[in-house]
Amino acid sequence: MYSLDIIPGKLSLKQLREVSRHPTKLSLDPNALPDMLISADVVAQVIKEDKTVYGINTGFGLLANTRIAEKDLETLQRSIVLSHAAGIGEFMDDATVRLMIILKINSLSRGYSGIRPLVIDALIQLVNSEVYPCIPKKGSVGASGDLAPLAHMSTVLLGEGEARYQDKIISGKEALDIAGLTPITLAPKEGLALLNGTQASTAFALEGLFAAEDLYASATVCGAMSVEAALGSRKPFDPRIHRVRGHRSQMDAALAYRHLLAQSSEIGLSHQCCERVQDPYSLRCQPQVMGACLQQIRNSADILEIEANSVSDNPLVFADDGDIISGGNFHAEPVAMAADNLALAISEIGSLSERRMALLIDSGLSKLPPFLVDNGGVNSGFMIAQVTAAALASENKTLAHPASVDSLPTSANQEDHVSMATFAGRRLGDMAENTRGILAVELLAAAQGLDFRAPNKSSDRIEIAKSLLRERVDFYDKDRYFAPDIAKANSLLKEATYNHLMPETLLPSL
């Protein structure tokens, strides 16, 4: 179990990656307590002085001008949680819920939300007990925050809704019992503070970021393997080429290929005097394409790290000034655009991989047996595996359409521009799965091509990459049931097996 001490506003991408992959034991820096208490006191003072402040003693959305009597304030907070828990579809994975809750704890504990520490402590206890609220994946437009997902999270604090514990669906009341908690009566503003925020969108987008990083590492390894299998040149990775263009991520991408391919190899030496002048773009332009993808990954990482540590509640309590101010930090446009950029990178990584794989099975280009199998005609080899890769690449092109350019007014036109960040982040999971499938096919093809180059060997790192695959998948000597081979290669990549072959500091969270 991963241990994390939350210092509000200081979560790193490396910490968030661990949280997304492992059950987590949480603690909260005690220095956060004073700010939370002071913030909650400011809210209490509003009630005491009978002021009218949005979110504390008013309705919500279009009903913001409706004043709520003091006797109804507890009911108001409970009602907003229950009424807003209106999501639909399959439940989020436990890992996504865990990440979302931790992001919410990080935001609330900064002391700008007027929420009591006991509410945050309850969220911590849910995570520590591995009790995860059942949260439908669909139902948020990413402004005013992720209302429905966060409402489903919050229902469990009231002893309502459902949760998942050890893969079983249980009631909210049972969930509290397991976590050693009792139902919470929410104080003024606490329901709204729990619901307002970008944490669902950000959790989805962060998972997409971490997947994109893993895919980038895998694709670089597969691409280097394909260079060797196709008897490609190392010259396109020469640092001088990339230095004069000036893009740092392109230079770093080229460095990664040099790191993998080394200065030469037996395979490389075997074709130094060949007649080929230039390689096809899918081999030669890898630093340019992958460098551009790396830049999008890095840009998105910067945005998402800021958002993960942000306060996206509304209204905000500025205790030092005694002010409670309404704004729009719940609008997840930065998250949506970051996710859209990740979608472009994930799609392009897969698209380039599919082209390399297509090159390998083309004997005219690769000088390998047609479809990478002996006795062609009797054997079809990798023929239909490439069709599968093409289908996945094409599907990703549709999914890569930017979500952030879409908007549909809600709440009787009070919330008249929204980000669609939740979908922008959520679809990254499907895209990553598609690209991983494409890479799995290329990995099999590249390893097959390298084996056909025997007894000549590639560089040490490429040989390590091939041997890791060969521990699971044998050489394809004749036609056999192909799907299990793809599944095994896919599993290898899903485990991020090749991340350790990358240069350090290349990817933001690694």
Swiss-Prot record:
A single GO molecular function term of this UniProt record: histidine ammonia-lyase activity
Which PROSITE patterns does the record associate with it? PAL_HISTIDASE (PS00488)
* SUPFAM superfamilies in alphabetical order: L-aspartase-like
Q: Please give the pathway this protein is involved in.
A: Amino-acid degradation; L-histidine degradation into L-glutamate; N-formimidoyl-L-glutamate from L-histidine: step 1/3
Q: Might you give the EC number(s) for this enzyme?
A: 4.3.1.3
Please indicate if the UniProt record lists Lyase as a keyword.
yes
User: Which EC main class describes this enzyme?
Assistant: lyase
| Positions bearing the 5-imidazolinone (Ala-Gly) cross-link | A143-G145
Where is the PTM 2,3-didehydroalanine (Ser) found along the chain? S144
| Catalytic reactions on record | L-histidine = trans-urocanate + NH4(+)
Family of this protein: Belongs to the PAL/histidase family.
Under what name is this protein listed? Histidine ammonia-lyase
**Which species is listed as the source?**
Aliivibrio fischeri (strain MJ11)
The gene that this protein is the product of is hutH
